[in-house]
Swiss-Prot record:
Transmembrane segments: none annotated. It comes from the Eukaryota. InterPro entries: F-box-like_dom_sf, F-box_dom, FBXO31/39. CDD domains: F-box_FBXO31. Zinc-binding is required for the structure of the protein and facilitate folding. Its main location: cytoplasm. Pathway: Protein modification; protein ubiquitination. This is F-box only protein 31-B. Belongs to the FBXO31 family. Residues 59-105 form the F-box domain. One of its GO terms (cellular component) is cytoplasm. Residues 372-427 are annotated as: Disordered. Zn(2+) binds at C201, H209, C225, H231.
Length: 523
């Protein structure tokens, strides 16, 4: 009745009161249905020349509306409200069996645009698709990070036609950082005729096979393969390793000459094989976007030396920008903060000739580091003396340096092509200093801005982690780089241009809390 009352714009009718009075009297079911129809009747009155008069040409109740009008009304309501509406009366229940209503709910709420004829062939109704597939598994849509030790990953669960598919995002083959991501299906869910939804594992080369999905708790679910023999190959582990090496890394055994790289690759394969039966996923969010950000936050793929390409999430936190690893390695695992950029510490690059000199770049970066250390010591001394820094004693400006931004950009951080063609002001020439190693020599030769930053380095097993100084280089809206001063190494990052739905954080606090939890997942 509450739903009916909202539709009608009135409160409870007298029929509701009569039902309460007769409750427990053992009324006949047919009589109760008639009373239900009485309850939704609306006396439509209009004022004519100051007196109340009944409008003879207008329906006196919702039940008198043509069925196609009721279908249109019900189609505009959220699918979660329709079961309550079906309890109002018998006619409403009959109207709600119309598949057109559920087809619209599937399209508007989940983007399903399949032809009804495809459903008729399989004997599945739009109501079945909504209730048994989309609504039942709505909680797993969005972005997730698999719990694969230090390696992590990025999973995007989407509605794809009449399927729900979990796509694992793999970086392009090293060192081609500007190429698009590679997508690999790991599971799918669909309806078989009118039965419940079927979960299938997509690992291996023998086709889909039986699997399970369990929602462990809020923002966490797990998958389980029930036929792991589908993952095995006739040539045994050696054939599986060669296939994985070729498909995931774009390599062959003959390509790998460096002994250390051979060990890293073999270690990763052995580790991943332990998770081919059961795997747990934890929800992650796309970083929130603010108008004054240096560039649109989002996901980037970057070069990490012998570890290959890894995925990072770039986000802004006041005057600090952070890059958090979505995929990782045995040294610095997924979930850790790989870069931290101080947006209040811009660095002016010298001319190209001086820029080629590593000692010159090193001096610029270390000068900023020394200044920060002096200010920290001064602040500590003032606090010991009981003075405190105070707002009027700030050591340097707490406002990030201004930067030119395109007028319009995509919600997922992908800028428009017309905006990219606009030449931003104050472009600086850029070249890597001599002696700095780079996996990809095809880096931009001009940049917009540079800032002091720190990068996280560690020994094997994330032992003795420390932040080391470096230089953050903003090339354009889709690319940035980082010079690791201590390692004499350069990482180039390129934006992932994929669009993600169901990925927005409910609040800034929820996003910050997620970042904190990510660091604990792999430590």
């Amino acid at each position: 009745m509450a739903v009916c009352a909202r539709l009608c714009g009135v409160g409870q009718s007298g029929g509701c009161r009569r039902r309460r009075q007769r409750k427990g009297a053992g009324n006949d079911p047919e009589l109760e249905d008639e009373e239900e129809e009485d309850e939704v009747r609306i006396e439509a009155e209009v004022l004519v020349e100051g007196q109340a008069a009944v409008a003879p040409l207008r329906p006196r109740s919702l039940l008198q509306l043509p069925p196609e009008i009721l279908v249109e009304i019900f189609s505009s309501l959220p699918g979660t409200e329709l079961p309550s509406l079906a309890q109002v009366c018998r006619k409403f229940r009959q109207i709600l069996t119309t598949d057109t209503i559920w087809k619209r709910r599937c399209k508007q709420e989940y983007g399903v645009c399949e032809n009804l004829r495809k459903l008729e062939v399989t004997g599945v109704s739009c109501h079945d698709v909504y209730v048994k597939l989309l609504h039942q598994y709505r909680h797993i849509l969005g972005l997730w990070q698999p719990d694969i030790g230090p390696y992590g990953g990025l999973l995007n669960v989407v509605v794809d036609g009449l399927f729900i598919i979990g796509w694992m995002y793999l970086p392009p083959h090293d060192p081609h950082v500007d190429e698009g991501m590679r997508l690999k299906p790991v599971f799918r869910i669909h309806l078989m005729e009118r039965n419940n939804a079927t979960v299938e594992c997509m690992y291996g080369h023998k086709g889909p096979h039986n699997g399970q999905i369990q929602i462990v708790k809020k923002d966490e679910f797990s998958t389980k393969c029930l036929q792991t023999d589908y993952h095995r190959m006739s040539g045994g582990r050696q054939e599986e390793f060669r296939t994985w090496l070729r498909e995931d890394l774009g390599r062959t055994l003959e390509d790998i000459f460096h002994e250390h790289m051979q060990e890293l690759i073999l270690m990763k394969f052995i580790y991943i094989c332990q998770y081919d039966k059961c795997l747990t996923y934890r929800r992650i969010y796309h970083p929130p976007n603010r108008p004054d950000d240096l560039l649109n936050p989002g996901f980037f793929k970057g070069t990490y030396g012998s570890h290959g390409l890894e995925i990072v999430m770039f986000s802004f936190h006041g005057t600090i920008a952070k890059a958090t690893k979505i995929t990782g390695d045995p040294n610095v695992p997924a979930g850790q903060q790989t870069l931290e950029v101080d947006l209040t510490r811009p660095v002016q690059l010298p001319d190209v000739e001086h820029l080629r000199n590593f000692d010159e770049i090193s001096r610029l970066i270390l000068d900023v580091q020394s200044q920060i250390q002096r200010e920290q010591r001064q602040t500590g001394n003032e606090e010991d003396d009981g003075k405190g820094a105070g707002p009027d004693r700030a050591e340097h400006s707490q406002q990030p340096a201004p930067v030119h931004r395109p007028a319009k950009e995509d919600v997922n951080g992908v800028d428009n092509a017309d905006d990219r063609e606009q030449k931003p002001p104050n472009v600086q020439s850029f070249v890597l200093p001599a002696g700095v190693m780079a996996r990809n020599e095809e880096y931009p030769r001009s940049c917009k801005m540079c800032f002091y930053g720190t990068g996280l380095i560690a020994g094997h097993g994330f032992s003795s982690p420390e932040r080391t100084p470096g230089l953050f280089i903003l090339f354009d809206e889709d690319r940035f780089g980082f010079i690791w001063l201590e390692l004499k190494s350069f990482s180039l990052y390129s934006r992932m241009r994929d669009r993600f739905q169901h990925s927005e954080a409910p609040s800034l606090e929820a996003f910050d809390e997620m970042l904190q939890h990510m660091q604990s997942w792999t430590t």
